[in-house]
Amino acid sequence: MAHKKAGGSSRNGRDSAGRRLGVKKFGGESVIGGNIIIRQRGTKVYAGRNVGMGKDHTLFATAEGRVVFHKGKLGRSYVSVDALPLAAE
């Protein structure tokens, strides 16, 4: 009798899509309030002036201006937004 042994099932073969993390706005770029600057896991970079942090540690601009990266105490990296001066009417 012609029989074929059943093939074994593989336990591999799964993968998840990349999470699209990283810097979205680099130093010197212009941003407006609400623009995402960095998507990260944990606090690789901390929020400086005019930057807020979401519950998933996403850093976003809270004011219009230019993005600036700098080092702070304990060697921590910070990102700030140098706000544009308000135009006089």
Curated annotation (Swiss-Prot):
MF terms (GO), sorted A to Z: structural constituent of ribosome
* Gene Ontology CC annotations of this record: cytosolic large ribosomal subunit
Q: What residues form the membrane-spanning segments?
A: none
Residue ranges of the region described as Disordered: 1-20
Query: Could you tell me the superkingdom of the organism this chain comes from?
Result: Bacteria
- Record's keyword terms, sorted: Ribonucleoprotein, Ribosomal protein
> Does this UniProt record's set of keywords contain Membrane?
no
InterPro entries (alphabetical): Ribosomal_bL27, Ribosomal_bL27_CS
PROSITE patterns tied to this protein = RIBOSOMAL_L27
| A matching Pfam family | Ribosomal_L27
GO BP term, example? translation
Q: Its family?
A: Belongs to the bacterial ribosomal protein bL27 family.
Q: What is this protein called?
A: Large ribosomal subunit protein bL27
User: What is the species listed in this Swiss-Prot or TrEMBL entry?
Assistant: Zymomonas mobilis subsp. mobilis (strain ATCC 31821 / ZM4 / CP4)
